[in-house]
Amino acid sequence: SLADFTYILYSEFLTIDPENSDWDNRDRVVLSVGHTCMLIYSILYLCGYLKIEDLKSFRKLGSLTPGHPEIETPGIDANTGPLGQGVGMGIGMALAEKASSNSASKRYTYILAGDGDLQEPIALGASTLAGHWQLSNLIMFYDKNDIQIAGKTSRVDSTDYGKLYESMGWHVQEIDGHNHNEIRLA
């Protein structure tokens, strides 16, 4: 579902400019599930940010396609690594954008998060603030696939994150992450 969501996001919703990856008026994307970075690199290649040679250099020292996203790569807005870090960073970016932009700004910050991200206290603390502040320029896609490094997340976590985020003041929509129409309407 992360692949479907990311494809729809980049192909139909993001305001970006591959020829000017530092453009101030672009939307931001934070891949909190940094270990899935090859997905983003593939999308960045299709959008014109990267070359096929960059993809062939995946995880090589000094390449534009390291094993976790780094801002040296055109189209990457945040370095991420530890789970949950990207959630906090994305919320901080959305807050900074809201505080510094004019009222006509329509820029969004998108966070792509997974099960392991939301289990981290750094993500939950930042999410509490985002809900309280009602950051209308922030959208987080939570890929609830019940998988983590040691097996199913349900073995160690029974939290209903939809209800938890609603209690923190977030607008929550549960969708089929493989259904492109549901993604578009969310």
Model-based region annotation:
Residues 38, 118-120, 147-149, 181-183:
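Flexible loop/turn segments at secondary-structure boundaries
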Residues 68-75, 106-109, 139-147, 163-170:
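Gly-rich Lys/Arg/Thr-decorated short loops/hinges at beta-loop-alpha junctions or inter-strand turns
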Residues 77-80, 130-157:
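A short, conserved beta-to-alpha structural element at the edge of catalytic cores
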